[in-house]
Amino acid sequence: GLPVCGETCAFGSCYTPGCSCSWPVCTRN
């Protein structure tokens, strides 16, 4: 998906609902 989740997952996980990690950023599923 598009990187619209506004957080990084380079050092952890995504916390925004409906988002997944596409290193190093979170992307909308």
Swiss-Prot record:
Keywords: Disulfide bond, Knottin, Plant defense. Pfam families: Cyclotide. This is a cyclic peptide. The keyword Disulfide bond applies. Disulfide bonds join C5-C19, C9-C21, C14-C26. There is a cross-link at G1-N29 (Cyclopeptide (Gly-Asn)). GO terms for biological process: defense response. InterPro entries: Cyclotide, Cyclotide_sf. Signal peptide: none annotated. Probably participates in a plant defense mechanism. Belongs to the cyclotide family. Moebius subfamily. The presence of a 'disulfide through disulfide knot' structurally defines this protein as a knottin. This is Cyclotide vibi-C.
